């Protein structure tokens, strides 16, 4: 196949072919469910939703795993603050995650494992690492990974052990052999709730964050699989540590190809909960429709930083309306996409070059221009079909164009009827007043031989 993907591990674009012919196995790091998802999470979920959609469009079967971290220091802290159990908090946040993802048109992954369901697999991997001399139990009861015992550490991030400033990056804890060593199993603390403690050969405790993804990835996709993805902030240390754990345990390459999506920035800083500069998906959806938010994300390349502002979202909304306006001119005909021809070939070439959504979106606008000129049902059908591979343009055009108007449908139709009555009575001043009043409320009237229709102003 002709698909090329940027591999963070090799720092190069690589021709992609799955390890198992015709079947792609992909793991993407998901949410830590202690709070509502913010727009940065949406960016990652949308990016890899587009990836899996295009892999399927390319004729490949896809097993897509996106995990849920449902045990973590932040989760414990929030549950204690709220006076609720870990399970109550995480169940509630997972429900909210699903509602937000569904609203944004993000397809469900094949598997969505909760970390707490895979503790036995984590303990097995920790035992294997300890048996190979790659892990040790410290005096405080924690089991740590001995980073300097794994020769390949740093190959994903491009950092050598000598270059890493452990004092800045890793909290030095009692019992570590080296400041860079990281925890695989955290021993239980007396003050911690009972529902965050598991029995183990190492004593009561809970898994570290990094071992969770290694164990779930191997359990669901095998010891070696095709693609591992996540946000750029996970490249180091999380993904670096996953490689050390998984390859240390199995002796095999973990993921063949590593993909990382860029940040969403606010005032040139990464949007994050820790910085307090984040907007939840729900906050944004109070102001903008879900497809506009998705389009805002998709029209930038997944590896590029994306700057959040109302101006950029307003522009995304106006641009998306131009595409829907073209689709409103003629009913799209069902089409069988010929990927070797014209617009479809250009769209495919864009997507086959590291999921080049900006170029693919440019093809959609060129095709919309063709629809505007030709009023061709086939061209409109192709526009809708190509947009669907990005999770776009599947709504009813009239419904989309009317969305966001200040009045409800019945009130607008009453005004249109009153204007028609005024025009019939040759009271053109009153007809113009009604048109202008509606325009002031963001509603544009369009007269034609078949009557008057309306849409929200751009």
From Swiss-Prot:
UniProt GO molecular function: ATP binding; cysteine-tRNA ligase activity; zinc ion binding
Cofactor: Zn(2+)
Keywords: Aminoacyl-tRNA synthetase, ATP-binding, Cytoplasm, Ligase, Metal-binding, Nucleotide-binding, Protein biosynthesis, Zinc
Motif 'HIGH' region per record, residues: 31-41
Enzyme class: ligase
Location in or out of the cell: Cytoplasm
UniProt-listed GO biological process terms: cysteinyl-tRNA aminoacylation
Enzyme Commission designation: 6.1.1.16
Binding-site list for ATP: 273
Reactions catalysed according to its record: tRNA(Cys) + L-cysteine + ATP = L-cysteinyl-tRNA(Cys) + AMP + diphosphate
Primary localization class, coarse: cytoplasm
InterPro entries recorded: Cys-tRNA-ligase, Cys-tRNA-synt_Ia_DALR, Cys-tRNA/MSH_ligase, CysS_C, Rossmann-like_a/b/a_fold, tRNA-synt_1_cat_dom, tRNAsynth_Ia_anticodon-bd
Cofactor descriptive note: Binds 1 zinc ion per subunit.
Gene Ontology cellular component terms for the protein in this record: cytosol
Motif ('KMSKS' region): 270-274
Binding positions for Zn(2+) per the UniProt entry: 29, 213, 238, 242
Assembly information from the UniProt record: Monomer.
Family: Belongs to the class-I aminoacyl-tRNA synthetase family.
UniProt protein name: Cysteine--tRNA ligase
Gene expressing this chain: cysS
